[in-house]
């Protein structure tokens, strides 16, 4: 039975109404760093330092001052949104009773580990300080694996509100509450009404949007409240909020199509209440993951969540007996009550159960929840330590739990707020109240900053007709803009004497008919650079003019790190005679680059000395990989000496969804049998999280090779024929097969 006496929460001391007191005297306008430093040195309580409108480049602003509760000291923009801080810049501040507002950090990066820091040194922190109405947008180092924090909160009794944090592209937490000294514990911070805008998939651990604490201090109390924030497709990794300390309240936030979960990774006495998770059927969208002791999860709403395993709609994990702080404390004395789950895929109980995580939940409860739709309950261990009572499940659904669930009709309608809602009668049964977002997107973020995205789709721009000839493709690329379409002549002949560099989304294609032939005098035909994305259709790439080098390729990614995810779409192309020397690849993904999607469709590859897709350059075994979604469908591969695909995700990290690979309806003939071929496979997959191979034939080819790692990978190979081809090789039997025929 739940020990209610343990479910207490430390009070949050709200001093923030003090900031409504307005000071307008003693304002000093500063126009450069020298003037700023002089103003800081002499500012008094009640003073204002005003940054002049314009661009401030390569500035490290250090703001040390002490106001009083009735005489705050302000640092602000002359006009909110008109002070643009860029280049190698950052802002740090310490003292007390400070207000910072109206600044925009855009298209730069920090020279240190933090963009906005609530301290100026280890011992000098900010207390009773408010940061409001600021923006950080694309303030990311180009070095994708380099980690930094956009906002680091130290000290106590600080307020971070109505800010917009958008487009973080490199590793590191967007907003982190730091607790590395006593001066920053039991901090009573308030984080509210912020807009956490889209964050691309990082492809590794270290992409959290909000983290409170770390494993080192997870049993210390932070007493931080995060409320009324809007998380908009913050897809960096699967821990959108990573709670890693005790006594925190995560209440009335909205998670819109976020790939990941609100995760109680470490710490106890967490209050998770009144949050809305809107998955809308998008891939990998998750809800709440419960770990540790005395957690309270109540009155949350979950709709259209598709995540599985550790990323389900509601996940209760197994723990480690006598766990060290950096692992998984068992779920004890916790409550999951009065929540609504609609049209979501999975509820996972005892998730992560293995030899180490062998402790199931105990003295916990799961009561008065409404679960409607085709939700699957997965049980991975004994759940007798959870008291199930008063839950409602629609009549068509089922659960392996024997008691505590009553059947009810699937009574769901779209209410006046545009949300799927159970009937009022069902809501009244659990005392949920009206289904309504606690905060809207428009109510969050900096008041002056648009939330409109600048996404450019393929073929959304103008058409550029490209005549046959030497370097005409290069000229067209130089004159193109994002979304443009380069249309080549049917049957034309094109020669490249320089690298074709792609710096924005572009389509190179020919209309239906004879394919134009593209050859190159350079070792690489096309380089996808940072910001680029490429679509090719109805083309013929031929290696006859390529130089006599090992390691040539048709398409590759930048040799330096790219912090903007790219995509590659290949449809109905022909690739021939990549054989002037060894290891001539069609596509090579270099380290430090990442694709949201790669698709190879309805194409033909003949006489290739390298691999078709080489994506094995992330070899540090830290859970880093090269592509999130890979699709190979409807292709013919003949006389390819290496693999059709080699894809590597090393290490044991569980923080990502991908790689996700679909291979269907392909034909392989004499593939993977080159005398210098290193893996000895026609397809090689290491650490892939989800792999489906179907309706594909092999003839006189090397086998498929699998290396399955942790993270509960799902691998299915079905309806395939392997003639004169070796049997599937794997390091363990954690994969499934169906209708695999060997001849």
Language-model region placement:
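Glycine- and acidic/polar-rich repeat regions and solenoidal domains
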Residues: 60-61, 87-93, 106-128, 136-404, ...
